[in-house]
From Swiss-Prot:
Residues 3-58 form the HTH deoR-type domain. GO terms for biological process: negative regulation of DNA-templated transcription; phosphoenolpyruvate-dependent sugar phosphotransferase system; regulation of DNA-templated transcription. The gene is srlR. PANTHER family: GLUCITOL OPERON REPRESSOR, HTH-TYPE TRANSCRIPTIONAL REGULATOR SRLR-RELATED. This is Glucitol operon repressor. Pfam families: DeoRC (PF00455), HTH_DeoR (PF08220).
Amino acid sequence: MKPRQRQAAILEYLQKQGKCSVEELAQYFDTTGTTIRKDLVILEHAGTVIRTYGGVVLNKEESDPPIDHKTLINTHKKELIAEAAVSFIHDGDSIILDAGSTVLQMVPLLSRFNNITVMTNSLHIVNALSELDNEQTILMPGGTFRKKSASFHGQLAENAFEHFTFDKLFMGTDGIDLNAGVTTFNEVYTVSKAMCNAAREVILMADSSKFGRKSPNVVCSLESVDKLITDAGIDPAFRQALEEKGIDVIITGESNE
């Protein structure tokens, strides 16, 4: 396993366990304590973990970590969610991609489509799209660059979305609350609101760790969401509550025929 893959796996392990020792991680990943300590130093510098005496815990104070760090968490689940999301795209579609780490996983899969129009405020997504060989039109809104999310925000960005109507919006989230709706830690969330208003269909992409979480800022109500793509870890009662709100819940790996 490559170091970056192992570091992503360590974060996923900590998501489940909360805290653990170096020895436990070394045994789980079949490697040495020295190797694990090197990984933990890198993750600590990234702000995603806090090292303790002989062990490590997730850094829960880092409520809105940089996009490069988010991509390391629940990577496999995000890839499966992205694969499911792409199945709802067709040649000729116009789509919005938000700047989330789950949505970012969609980009390599877009190479199969031609004559699609993609608007995004994410610099990472634009760079990745430019590497594809398919026929596409890429639109960016402009605005003020936010380094933490590698994306553009502000009034200029919001105004840009008001001038277009798109077929679909693919959007991630930091938390889904049955009462509050789709929420985020991102303090410059109003551009996400503008994206919702510009799309005929809102497709929410979230792994099951996001359910029941309520972040400070509300992007939209659940009534605004048409589809939710998630993994099999969703609580059945939570799924039923979402479906009662009219949301089509798609579970990765589950037949939806």
